[in-house]
Amino acid sequence: MTEFLPFVARHIGPRHEDERAMLAALGLPSMETLITQAVPASIRLNRALNLPAALSEADALAELGTIMGRNVVKKSFIGAGYHGVHTPPVIQRNLFENPAWYTAYTPYQSEISQGRLELLFHFQTLVAELTGLPVACASLLDEATAVAEAIGVACRHHRDKRSRILLAGELHPQTVDVVNTRAEPLGWEIATGSDVDDNTAAIVVPWPDTRGVYGDFAKVIADAKAKGALVIAVADPLALTIMEAPARWGADMAVGSMQRYGVPMGFGGPHAAYLAVSEALTRIIPGRIVGQSVDAHGRAAYRLALQTREQHIRRDKATSNICTAQALLANMAAAFAIWHGPAGLQAIATRVAALAARFAAALKAAGVEIAGESLFDTVTAKVPGKAAAIAAEADKGGRLIRIIDADTVGVTFDETSTEEDLTALASLFGAKPVGGDTVLVPGKERGEGFLTQEVFHSHRSETEMMRFLRRLADKDLALDRAMIPLGSCTMKLNAAAEMMPVSWNTVANLHPFAPAEQVQGYAKMTSDLEAWLCEITGFAGVSLQPNAGSQGEYAGLMAIRHYHQAWGQGHRNICLIPSSAHGTNPASASMAGMSVVVVNCRPDGDIDIDDLKAKAEKHRDNLAAFMITYPSTYGVFEEGIKAFCEIVHDNGGQVYFDGANLNALVGLARPADIGADVCHMNLHKTFCIPHGGGGPGVGPIGVAKHLVPYLPGHVEAGSEHAVAAAQFGSASILVITWMYIRMMGGAGLKKATEAAILNANYIAHRLKGVYPILYTGAHDRVAHECIVDTRVLKDSAGITVEDVAKRLIDYGFHAPSMSWPVAGTLMIEPTESEPKLEIDRLCDAMIAIAGEAKKVADGVWPADDNPLANAPHTASDTLATEWKHPYTREEAVFPGGAFDPTAKYWPPVSRVDNVGGDRNLICSCPPVAAYG
């Protein structure tokens, strides 16, 4: 037996004796026997992964510390969308570094997500108040992506009858790069200037622009309104605390980055972007929206609203492919605003503006020409032929400024800037600081109050803030409390040793456009990670840029698109997608300019190879790609996977491998060896980056050698086709995956995969006598997850899958994936991190629920008044003076003979009214004046 370092044993849940007992329950003598039965021999990797030997936690932390110590952290005045911040320690400690917040899943199950839903609701309120627009989503991926998404909203608003987009001012270069990437496959015409014509869908107004200047856009906005074009503001949210809200001057949408609300730069991310829109655009915007509804007893409750817009329902007709966004960072931004309150935010903004104004005045007094008269935090100076020399002098003093071109530099102030910085920077230009007024746009200062809601005024002491964040966290069920057995989500351990480096100064506080010689630690860490991921997947190249799995899909499909174009095959636009695919697949294909053709699945869940062959041959002249998830979304290793790939290749297409289920492959098989040309990897699933309650995520792509030239580029690297604002996307959290792989080693990673497969098969074995297990492969085995058919309870007792999901809350569990990929079923993925004790507890709960359903079927409990129909049960409901139900209070909240009371979770609300919440959409808290 292989001996593992302590970390491997601590990451994997079952002990040696548990593993033996589980294998015995399956009637198997060894783990190898199980893997032989579950994984087709034709795809097995018959060698060890060539990765560095595993290190202990202490040694891995020391090695990474040495690597990241090569970074030189200097004070950044580069700006361009990234700013130094003071993250309040009360937020860093109690939210950012708290597993109760970062290990939670996207809040689809409202009743166990009220804490983070409430804070996201406050985030939306914050954005609505800053922008003056009534509807905001609960974050997007970054500012550049948000601009592209807003343009998509404008085109949908015009029913795709208008395709021209006017960039009315100077946006950040990375934003233009991402917009251009998005525009090409969708046929958008990107123009600059001030000419609005009848084909213009929207104008994009930077507020301020990349030079820091507030331009005069009154005429172009008026022209846009006259022509029916929408107005998109790209607005700095700190500036909006003292500047007029964009809605006041005609914006229909506003987007931007919330990074400077307490979120470190992190060499580019992760950060939450915002999007706010007018009410008329509500139903066509991307991303999650948190809405307010009521529960079964009339109590206010939060939920995800208007989900029919989203990819998991609308597929290729969705408003976007956005799935995971940036919930954790949005919650940090909301907490930052709650901590400081409106007066505190304005004080920060006013101080920043004053520093910039005094710097501008000093330069002008010294005869230096600056761009514009109206500014907030940035001064752009003309220094003919001296830009590099001035930047070098600033660097010597420990400060980085932006070189725009050989004759122009930019200096951006933020909340970390000091009087000493002002003096030192002015001296570079032969100037001395002078007194000066804060220069704003005349008539554009914020006149009205904002953030009058009580929550933004009630948490000024650290004691109050600490308890506020604790109360919210206690409302939720995250991995720190119980197993989250969501199928296709891989909710595994996010080990403390993996998470610790994210807060290091050498990780958190670097600007993504810092000089290359100062970020050698990041260069080494990302190079290691790219090489390791290539070895794990078999690919020739990897891009770490995509900052979500959905963006990885998009980047991979765009690589395929550009490859076909380079070979004179740009007409290839057909993407074959199985009917069982994740909803992001067809949504991403549409964004990449492809037309989706659905491939049927057989009754046993496998792809219908005859249908695939027929459709590949039918579209052979235009076939671009085939998207496949493996193991399948039904939790099975399909024996015909290599044949599927051969059919597609024989007909001129490329194979896109959805890596959502890579946790069943690592160390056992490699996508490239199977026949894939490109694959995205969800680092927030297989490789231990936490889900954060709905983000951040990271979705790098691996590609075969012929696709390497078509990986995403970046304007800072002198290349094109960026899919995210920063070259390495959410760079700071890549250290989590680096640590995971470094501590596991190749053998440990393989062992984790085996344990995940064992846990899933053990669950299937324990439950199959009570619930049908819908799909199995050869030898009656599943992969790393299984579909449990709860429709038998519907047939016998009228108990729905939702009833089962809500009842599991009373047993102390987050429900498995509900009604996906098969309606009326639950898909369970235990991951390798769950111990046998917890797995047995889940199985016991599922079996007990079947017993409760039998009581309904037998007439012991009425169909409309039983523990399942009324689940979940809150403490207040259970302690009510009157108890009129035919079951006892104990049966309600301490169910099942084997229930462990120490695992009890009390939901803060009972079942939430989803329909009512969508019919009466409330997605921000009204200001105090609204109650007068």
From Swiss-Prot:
Modified residues (N6-(pyridoxal phosphate)lysine): K685
Pfam families in UniProt: GcvP2_C, GDC-P
Coiled coil: none
One annotated GO molecular function: pyridoxal phosphate binding
Catalytic activity field: N(6)-[(R)-lipoyl]-L-lysyl-[glycine-cleavage complex H protein] + glycine + H(+) = N(6)-[(R)-S(8)-aminomethyldihydrolipoyl]-L-lysyl-[glycine-cleavage complex H protein] + CO2
InterPro entries per the UniProt record, alphabetical: GcvP, GDC-P_C, GDC-P_N, GDC_P, PyrdxlP-dep_Trfase, PyrdxlP-dep_Trfase_major, PyrdxlP-dep_Trfase_small
KW Electron transport (keyword) present: no
GO cellular component assignments: cytosol; glycine cleavage complex
Annotated GO biological process: glycine decarboxylation via glycine cleavage system
Keyword Ribonucleoprotein: no
Cofactor: pyridoxal 5'-phosphate
Summary of the function given for this chain in its UniProt record: The glycine cleavage system catalyzes the degradation of glycine. The P protein binds the alpha-amino group of glycine through its pyridoxal phosphate cofactor; CO(2) is released and the remaining methylamine moiety is then transferred to the lipoamide cofactor of the H protein.
Name of the featured protein: Glycine dehydrogenase (decarboxylating)
Organism: Brucella canis (strain ATCC 23365 / NCTC 10854 / RM-666)
Lineage summary: Bacteria, Pseudomonadati, Pseudomonadota, Alphaproteobacteria, Hyphomicrobiales
